[in-house]
Amino acid sequence: MLGARVAAHLDALGPLVPYVPPPLLPSMFYVGLFFVNVLILYYAFLMEYIVLNVGLVFLPEDMDQALVDLGVLSDPGSGLYDADSELDVFDAYLE
């Protein structure tokens, strides 16, 4: 057979291009980058879940007083918005 003789002759010559193993480091870099991105997405959705579902439970009723307790505002009167004064006006209007 002619094909078998040609194949044997080419095998005897050896490879025409020397074998170069594929670089392992860049591929492992991209695998690591993928897992880092997965972790970032996991923690982003976890924080979103905590803020939207758990954090709303712990919001105080009086935000001005909460800011005073934290030391952000010096006194409750320095708040930007006072809802109690508007309720007093509406109560007087209804009576």
UniProtKB/Swiss-Prot annotation:
Highest levels in heart. Also expressed in brain, liver, pancreas, placenta and lung. Up-regulated in emphysematous lung compared to normal lung. Induction: By dexamethasone. It holds the Pfam family Dexa_ind. It comes from the Eukaryota. Belongs to the DEXI family. PANTHER family: DEXAMETHASONE-INDUCED PROTEIN. This is Dexamethasone-induced protein. It comes from Homo sapiens (Human).
